[in-house]
Amino acid sequence: IGAATEDTHEGMATLEKTADDLRASEFVPFKAGMDAGAHLVMVGHVSAPNLTGDNTPCSLSAEVITNLLRGELGYNGIVITDAMDMSAITEYYDSGEAAVMALKAGADMILMPEDFEAAYEGVLTAVRDGVISEEQINESLRRIYRVKYRDRIDQDGNVVDNISGQQAPVEGEGQEGTAGEGQEGTVAEG
């Protein structure tokens, strides 16, 4: 976000603007992108205490991801964190803790945790213990699959080669799955 003067690669960055000021300035291009059909929004590690009520990075904040992006702005696409190996995260959280916090906050994807195995184990344990529900993971997967397949299905429900735009050959029967929200047909998965 433009008003942050610090670099989250190097440490914590804080926005001191009020929530109303952020809505009137920094959020305008994000809202325009969402309205234009952006498939993915990356949430950075900047802290916005006047928006969230504390110094939690936006990428780990349910106030930002769930309440603002998904609730107030009505965004239902993929939310991905900025790289989790940045100092704004690694100086304050271990990889497992940060990954769990991001998913609990509403992120669908965790980008580049400092320690992938620790992040994976943290999430796995959180799901096993009921800290993160399987339904939440499944909803994130639905968002990801919807985007993944959206650009691969033509209006007739045929799988299309992403590079040429031509119908892709499908060998064998494969497995059938739904094409995606608002589209009819099946896709071959393999």
Report each predicted region and the residues it spans.
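Second-shell residues forming the walls of enzyme active-site clefts
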Residues: 1-136, 143
